[in-house]
Amino acid sequence: VYGEVAFMPELRYRANFGIDIYNSSQDTFRPSTIPVANTEGNPESEPEATAKTAKMYNWLFEQTMTYNKDIKGHSISALAGWTMQYQRDESTYAFANGFITNNIPTLNAGTVTRGNTNASEWALLSGLARVQYNYKGKYMLTGALRADGASRFGKENRWGWFPSVSAGWRLTEESFMKSLTFIDDLKLRASYGLTGNFRIPNYGAQGEVAYYSYVLGGSSADVVKGAAPKSMPNPELHWEKTAQVNVGFDAS
């Protein structure tokens, strides 16, 4: 959904909001009449059942102000705004066996022997500004700045700054090019900008702890669960930045 308000002909405000929702569930039951591969010729095996769910929702909220003005061949266009994006993922898994009958395929008819739940989330907050200048379609200049803050990085490295600038010169609008009738349009252009990448695990900077099974005891050993580091924290993780330079011309 979106809404737009014009405060004056040159100044407009726009807000956008969108949301994506995903839900999935899967239940399986394998009766004893369907043997598994390692039954060594046994025509029947123990029934098994699983239950899985997965959920995701992602929302994006954007607000921008735009200003456009033309004064005697001088055209100015400016944009400023900010965006917020948030996503959460959840999943569950359960496995059961020990069913005494094939007629009740729900987990509570057996013994749940393992399972887990997972949840993760991330957020991105961004601010942006851009100014474009054009003089009679002959000289063009654009400057932009974007700042992004990502929850995936540590507190000291969450923000990345990404400037860009571009310029263009349409030579065919110059008087000294008018005699060259075989060229309809010729423009020189150059640009420089930084882009960022924050595609790392949601908690890559913090480290994670997970539960693992291990054997405890001697002759009458039991399998128990214990917590141990799954990944080590790295608070120095920061935005990956890529510089792009483009120089060229357009001709027709």
Label each residue range with its predicted role.
Residues 32-34, 38:
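Short amphipathic helix-turn modules centered on a small-residue break
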